């Protein structure tokens, strides 16, 4: 069975939803959490992904990559990236392509990774979590992205998916995914559209989307966002508040200690959640810094005062969207809030004040996006039948093209705006007139920079009116494409010689002669050879990243298996040392027990030594096998001696039952030969005699010796008796022989009216009459 999956890739956490015939399930990870941390950490032997990365973060700060979403597809020198890096603990650098890269220590070596490679590792973890849940390989997936993401970021996600071995069949905007999961199950009018406003406050960004519903479809009317502010600003506000308080009260500066700062941030995040349902919240951290335990308290009123400016910034996209659409809150049937940030009661209060109406909280703030992504995946999958529901989304960024020839001729053309549909229903044909056979460039631009540059070195010579044409479109991911660059020449068709005209009389009606027909034009198209350059990973770098990911996965698997073997060896030693003093004590001689215990202690000492701390999988496996050669015979003796009484009793029960069946008097088995029944009874007696002799011999044997009775052999004897009994006692009775009836002979002297003689009843007939 094919499974379709939706990933919600968040700044702090990821969620996974799987669409199956029974519906959409949000699945839990290996520690039963439905939220998987968006973290990747590098250790001495293996990588730690998701939950394990979070566990190792404080012990491995410099090699733990967090907030991956804030850097993927972002150029290193942008103000946004530089501001983000001020708060991070890991080492980053500018790659040759201008994007963000990471420097880490992995397996004792200095390694560098692109953002796509890091995200590919996280996606690989989500893929394995999903496969563990469905117990099948998973490949097709829809991944959510912020509605404001540009071309660079979207293509980076596709590359990360390729590195993870995923087939991303669509990148869906987060607010659109929420709108889909909200609307697909509801009944909408076919004629009267219904407007719903979605407010999504995430950890690091805020987005608002106005959606119109009609029967079988949704249409995004418009969106607005602030990419740089989300609920984490409340965490930072609380961090600054308590850092100042602790500096005054305890004389410590948490900003000077990275571990202390991380612990304080984690504590402040809990405070923020507590204040959502309580009027005050405490902070208590043991040994935060300089062996000092710290405590603090804050109430909701103080928090709202501190965070007031941040809340005003968060609601700004909402106000901006309503202004752009020239709509009022009353024109929406419902205003749905989603995202982890909307849990804050204070923020809800602020949103309600700005809108002048109540908010709706019917959406699961943490799972609506991944559910919508999984539904979209099911809708696009050929193996699922889903209720017809069209998703009409809009572009996330404007696109324009700039034509520049070698001689300096320039032309500009706007192609897509924020209201353009994605995917583009039909590719657009753009055209630029040319007058010279010379090379040119088509530069595709947007607000964030250059998307692509198409370059043609030269074009064929032409003599007629000509132009350059190209096909452009936005695909289902919201990514721009340009293709089929052609030279289009308009060639007038040659006129054929007209026959000599003879003088003709002017028509009587005085009509003038018809004017000559316009010359026909023939269009000649010539495909041009062009190169397209884009920012981001090249095909060579992507291929290398895929190969490197495969090697690292193999290394991770080996490290995990090695750790499992080491743990198995340690567990076996502890287990056997305990059992030799208890449950196995009576099954081993004192001398053998001492020898075994000596070996167990020796291996434990080796494990705890520097040599045993770091060994290969085969070494641990060999040590474990050596100990099992000593311990397995003891455990087998105990198991055999415990198992054989049940097997013996089972054999005796079967023998007794079969013998009693064979000796039942009466008609039940009277069709079976006496000799056969006697032989069956003898087989039963022989089996009992055989097992009694073995039991007597076993009872005279010490428990420290191997068990004489083979349980498997006893059960085989029982099965043999059952088969023999079935063959003999299961024979069907022969069918009674039918006596043919004699036809009555006609007697001339017999009168037809004479009464027929009643037949004399046989013994069986009389019995039948009685039974009736």
Swiss-Prot record:
Disulfide bonds: none annotated. GO terms for molecular function: adenyl-nucleotide exchange factor activity; ATP binding; ATP-dependent protein folding chaperone; unfolded protein binding. Residues 497-513 have a biased composition (Low complexity). It comes from the Eukaryota. Residues 735-772 have a biased composition (Basic and acidic residues). The keyword tRNA processing does not apply. Keywords: ATP-binding, Chaperone, Nucleotide-binding, Stress response. GO terms for cellular component: cytosol; nucleus; phagocytic vesicle. One of its GO terms (biological process) is protein folding. SUPFAM superfamilies: Actin-like ATPase domain, Heat shock protein 70kD (HSP70), C-terminal subdomain, Heat shock protein 70kD (HSP70), peptide-binding domain. May function in protein folding and assembly, and disassembly of protein complexes. PANTHER family: HSC70CB, ISOFORM G, HSC70CB, ISOFORM G-RELATED. Belongs to the heat shock protein 70 family. This is Heat shock protein 88. The gene is hspH.
């Amino acid at each position: 069975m094919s499974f379709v999956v939706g990933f919600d890739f968040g700044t702090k956490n990821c969620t996974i939803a799987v669409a199956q015939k029974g519906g959409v399930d949000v699945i839990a990870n290996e520690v039963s959490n439905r939220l998987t941390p968006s973290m990747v950490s590098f250790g001495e032997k293996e990588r730690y992904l998701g939950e394990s990365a979070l566990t190792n973060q404080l012990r491995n700060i410099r090699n733990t990559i967090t907030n991956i979403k804030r850097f993927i597809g972002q150029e290193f020198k942008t103000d946004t990236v530089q501001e983000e890096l001020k708060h991070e603990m890991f080492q980053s650098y500018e790659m040759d392509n201008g994007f963000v890269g990471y420097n880490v220590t992995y397996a004792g070596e200095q390694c560098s990774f692109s953002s796509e490679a890091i995200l590919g590792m996280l996606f690989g973890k989500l893929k394995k979590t999903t496969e563990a849940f469905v117990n099948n390989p998973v490949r097709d997936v829809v991944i959510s992205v912020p509605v404001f993401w540009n071309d660079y970021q979207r293509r980076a996600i596709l590359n990360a998916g390729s590195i993870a071995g995923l087939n991303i069949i669509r990148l869906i905007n987060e607010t659109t995914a929420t709108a889909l999961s909200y609307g697909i199950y509801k009944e909408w009018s076919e004629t009267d559209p219904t407007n719903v406003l979605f407010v999504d406050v995430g950890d690091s960004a805020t987005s608002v989307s106005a959606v119109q519903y009609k029967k079988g479809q949704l249409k995004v009317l418009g969106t607005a966002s602030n990419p740089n502010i989300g609920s984490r600003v409340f965490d930072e506000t609380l961090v600054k508040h308590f850092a100042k308080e602790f500096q005054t009260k305890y004389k410590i500066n948490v900003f000077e200690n990275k571990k202390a700062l991380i612990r304080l941030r984690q504590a402040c995040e809990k405070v923020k959640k507590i204040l959502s349902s309580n009027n005050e919240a405490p902070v208590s951290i043991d040994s935060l810094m300089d062996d000092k335990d710290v405590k603090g308290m804050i109430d909701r009123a103080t928090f709202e005062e501190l965070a007031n400016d941040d809340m005003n910034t968060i609601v700004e996209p909402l106000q901006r969207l309503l202004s752009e659409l020239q709509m009022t809150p009353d024109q929406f049937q419902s205003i749905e809030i989603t995202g982890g940030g909307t849990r804050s009661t204070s923020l809800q209060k602020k949103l309600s004040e700005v809108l002048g109406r109540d908010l709706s909280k019917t959406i699961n703030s943490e799972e609506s996006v991944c559910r919508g992504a999984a539904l979209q995946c099911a809708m696009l999958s050929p193996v699922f039948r889903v209720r017809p529901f069209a998703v009409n989304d809009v572009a996330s960024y404007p696109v324009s093209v700039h034509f520049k020839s070698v001689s300096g001729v320039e032309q500009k053309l706007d192609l897509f705006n924020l209201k353009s549909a994605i995917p583009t229903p039909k590719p657009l044909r753009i055209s630029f007139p040319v007058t010279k056979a010379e090379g040119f460039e088509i530069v595709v631009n947007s607000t964030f920079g250059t998307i692509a540059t198409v370059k043609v070195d030269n074009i064929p010579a032409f003599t007629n009116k000509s132009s350059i044409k190209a096909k452009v479109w936005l695909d289902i991911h919201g990514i721009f494409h340009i293709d089929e660059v052609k030279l289009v020449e308009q060639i007038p068709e040659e006129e054929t010689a007209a026959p000599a005209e003879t003088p003709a009389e002017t028509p009587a009606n005085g009509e003038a002669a018809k004017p000559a027909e316009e010359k026909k034009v023939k269009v000649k198209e010539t495909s041009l050879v062009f190169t397209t350059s884009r920012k981001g990973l090249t095909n060579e770098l992507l291929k290398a990243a895929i190969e490197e990911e495969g090697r690292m996965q193999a290394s991770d698997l080996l490290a995990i298996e090695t750790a499992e073997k080491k743990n198995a060896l340690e567990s076996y030693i502890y287990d056997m040392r305990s059992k030799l003093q208890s449950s196995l004590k009576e099954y081993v001689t004192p001398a053998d027990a001492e020898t075994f215990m000596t070996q167990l202690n020796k291996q434990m000492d080796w494990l705890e030594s520097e040599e045993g701390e770091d060994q290969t999988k085969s070494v641990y496996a060999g040590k474990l096998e050596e100990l099992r050669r000593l311990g397995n015979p003891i455990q087998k003796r105990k198991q055999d001696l415990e198992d054989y009484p049940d097997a013996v009793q089972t054999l005796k029960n079967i023998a007794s039952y079969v013998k009693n069946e064979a000796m039942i008097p009466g008609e039940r088995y009277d069709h079976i030969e006496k000799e056969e029944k006697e032989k069956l009874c003898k087989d039963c007696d022989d089996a009992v005699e055989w097992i009694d002799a073995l039991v007597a011999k076993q009872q005279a044997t010490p428990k420290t010796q191997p068990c004489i009775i083979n349980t498997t052999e006893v059960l085989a004897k029982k099965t043999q008796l059952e088969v023999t009994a079935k063959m003999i006692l299961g024979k069907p009775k022969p069918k009674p022989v039918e006596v043919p009836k004699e036809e009555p002979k006609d007697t001339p002297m017999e009168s037809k009216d004479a009464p027929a003689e009643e037949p004399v009843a046989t013994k069986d007939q009389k019995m039948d009459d009685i039974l009736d």
